[in-house]
Amino acid sequence: MQQLRPIHRALLSVSDKSGVVEFAKALSQRGVELLSTGGTARLLAESDLKVTEVSDYTGFPEMMDGRVKTLHPKVHGGILGRRGQDDEIMAQHQISPIDMVVVNLYPFAQTVAKPDCTLADAVENIDIGGPTMVRSAAKNHKDVAIVVNSKDYKKIIEEMDNNQGSLTQSTRFDLAIKAFEHTAAYDSMIANYFGKLVPPYHGDTTQPSGRFPRTLNLNFIKKQDMRYGENSHQDAAFYIEENLSESSIATATQLQGKALSYNNIADTDAALECVKEFVEPACVIVKHANPCGVAIGKDIHEAYDSAFKTDPTSAFGGIIAFNRELDIKTAQAIIDRQFVEVIIAPSVNKDVLPVLATKQNIRVLVCGEWEDRAAGLDFKRVNGGLLVQDRDLGMVAVTNLRVVSKRHPTEQEMKDALFCWKVAKFVKSNAIVYAKNDMTIGIGAGQMSRVYSAKIAGIKAADEGLEVQGCAMASDAFFPFRDGIDAAAAVGVSCIIQPGGSIRDDEVITAADEHGIAMIFTGMRHFRH
């Protein structure tokens, strides 16, 4: 059953006023009486709409600088009153039924994001009346429609037109779910903010105690259900943060291809975040969340060609990310050369789509340009808990590098070392990356011992006929023994960049000197698990 409920009276009180005038006009044109408060009421009146101030309706003025506006029985009785059950008591107290509540809340998140936000500023942006009305209307969704998102305005009017001014129960229920999600997210933001302040509260809350609140409340919005998860017996869905600003897999738009799988999303994220490290035209090819080929060049076609040469076998069925617009020459080279699951770039030239359309299974994504990378949190689920840390946005400055070997690196060796250091940050530990002339030539990933990662990187380079002699090597963490240096020297590595910090650093440096290898310490580790 549709269980239609006509909309005769609506209360509008919004902080985000986008589209509210047009929505109110549409309601008024359909015979809906408008109640409103404060700034919303003034805006509607200035737009020549007939609107009744809530204070006139209740007979009680707004007070305490607007802190008390809608907390009144005539408001909440009108919202919570059960039609056909509470009619007599409502009439006795002159309470008019309110059939629709249109509310969004004080901008708490935007306020506390400002660098100069004080506790007093935050407190004044904690909405009280708004969430109370939202919850009241959502609770009584059997009779009342609650609207918290301006994106719903258009379809609400369309449904009213299709149902003689009424809304169906399914629509009211869907709106109620959105409302409870809205208030839950709002309260979570407030709890997280206060949880970061110096405990216990002694009046001095000017300095936060740290990045991590006492209770962590997370809110993500489901973007899509997935056919399955990492494996076919696992159910899965993809959730994203709200109000994202940085270009990412979460904000990307898909231009063609099948729906992204769980593994597609994880691998595309790895590829995109790696390619963001480079200023020059760059290409990153990823397989199973590990880069298998990375290169920079004068353009992305040259970068792709070099990245592919690192490991053509692993590149099959991989993910390709670029940091420049995808052009027709590069797109044609990809589809002529290999099977690829996903291509992601900031943009795609309009002439590229007909070329890619010949391979409809290729998922093509555009993510937009990016500037500075946004600080944030990374999460890792463990059984019974959640590990939380800052995103690894660290990248050592050249001025902080320390040459610890007798021989200093040449200009080209330093360039190669810095290149493969950027790549090593995105390779699963233990990570070893060989690079030469702006391209990776061997990557050893995920081994339990560092020396075996070094050996694997050398084997991969040899398998593809790539010249290791004179290349640079990056290690994501320090060498616990000299064996990794000996393995690198055996294949011709001439420069090594690594964090340093082992109790056997002297032994490791001695090994480098014995082999004539230049060694650079970064003082920064990049474990990735």
UniProtKB/Swiss-Prot annotation:
Pfam families in the record: AICARFT_IMPCHas (PF01808), MGS (PF02142)
GO MF term list: IMP cyclohydrolase activity; phosphoribosylaminoimidazolecarboxamide formyltransferase activity
Domain MGS-like: 2-148
Annotated SUPFAM superfamilies: Cytidine deaminase-like, Methylglyoxal synthase-like
EC number per UniProt: 2.1.2.3, 3.5.4.10
GO biological process: 'de novo' IMP biosynthetic process
Reaction it catalyzes: (6R)-10-formyltetrahydrofolate + 5-amino-1-(5-phospho-beta-D-ribosyl)imidazole-4-carboxamide = 5-formamido-1-(5-phospho-D-ribosyl)imidazole-4-carboxamide + (6S)-5,6,7,8-tetrahydrofolate; IMP + H2O = 5-formamido-1-(5-phospho-D-ribosyl)imidazole-4-carboxamide
Record's keyword terms, sorted: Hydrolase, Multifunctional enzyme, Purine biosynthesis, Transferase
InterPro entries, alphabetized: AICAR_Tfase_dup_dom_sf, Cytidine_deaminase-like, MGS-like_dom, MGS-like_dom_sf, PurH-like
Gene3D superfamilies (alphabetical): 3.40.140.20, Methylglyoxal synthase-like domain
GO cellular component, one term: cytosol
Pathway: Purine metabolism; IMP biosynthesis via de novo pathway; 5-formamido-1-(5-phospho-D-ribosyl)imidazole-4-carboxamide from 5-amino-1-(5-phospho-D-ribosyl)imidazole-4-carboxamide (10-formyl THF route): step 1/1; Purine metabolism; IMP biosynthesis via de novo pathway; IMP from 5-formamido-1-(5-phospho-D-ribosyl)imidazole-4-carboxamide: step 1/1
Disulfide bond residue pairs: none
Similarity comment: family membership: Belongs to the PurH family.
This protein's domain notes: The IMP cyclohydrolase activity resides in the N-terminal region.
HAMAP family: PurH
Matching NCBIfam families: PRK00881.1, purH
Name of the protein described by the UniProt record: Bifunctional purine biosynthesis protein PurH
Taxon lineage: Bacteria, Pseudomonadati, Pseudomonadota, Gammaproteobacteria, Enterobacterales
